[in-house]
Amino acid sequence: EVLHPIIVHALRYVDRYGDDVVARVEAFEAHLATSVYRPRDGLDWSTVPKTLISNCPDLGHPWREPWLIEPAGTYSPRYETTQELLHVTAACACLLMYLSGIRPLELTMLRRDCLQAVKDPKTGDVIRWKVIGLPAKKRVQKGKKPKPVEWVIPEEAARAVMLLQRAWESMRRRHDDDHLVLNAHALGTKSRKHGFPTTPQ
């Protein structure tokens, strides 16, 4: 009763809404790279490339209102973009953890290249997907690094990982960080804010 609507909506974010959010994040990042940040009034949002909101076939109308092009009270375009990026991240995380058994800490330690496709040697078709990362509870001998483990995941979870790879890519490059997911401050103008690193801890 509780999980069903969460998973349904998470799949909708991955398959229907994710492309719009990625386009918005990339537009923001491109604008950030060519703009001068002014501490008092922030960025000039009028020159941010416009991105569209797609119609959702399941809803029969656009899945959300148009993106802000200028601040509305205390609600800024940057804050709005960050919130939608976090919604996408939460949806992908729900799918990946529910369908694979990966723990939250293990998810935060995944790297960008964690996803691998296992192909049929004769046809070349993908027969299964797996994620490679570090376990959170496996005992490690003192002085030795933990050995990576594999989680076999279904295609839906693989699509979630691929969306996370795309959604955070521009920020990985900017912060020189290869983790699959960064924290919310990564979308800001600095790599650190209030002492929080870009990588989830």
Briefly describe each language-model feature range.
Residues 1-201:
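Extended, charge-enriched helical/coil interaction regions that scaffold DNA-processing
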